[in-house]
Amino acid sequence: MLPHQEVYREGMRCFTAAHRRLEWLAVRVLLYTLSGEEKEIAYHPSGKPYLADDSASLSISHTKGYVAVVLGLPGREVGVDIEQYGERVRKVAHKFMREDEQPSVFRGTDTWSLLLHWSAKETMFKCLN
């Protein structure tokens, strides 16, 4: 799966929660699968990830055991966000929805629309910042 597995085992030790270790490793597996080679992920002071060799732009998202990785052309920002379906989104909707934005009903509930709004805005934020 990944060459130099001892390096990845060492990196996983930074996390105490098992699900965070798996997410961290899954990001590296996806990155290796997409690029065909090992890539070092570095982080800006803001926490935004990037490839240390600047061979591509990078965006990462993870939630509850799922991860997503997107690569783009060097210097062209990309963004990705994944969210797990859940009613919790209603409790935080005021943080990402303006008063003049109304979620539509999709699949019989507005939960999907709220999640779509949240994820779309998070993706754009990652692209622009």
Locations of the language-model features?
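Core catalytic alpha/beta fold that binds nucleotide/phospho-ligands
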Residues: M1-N129
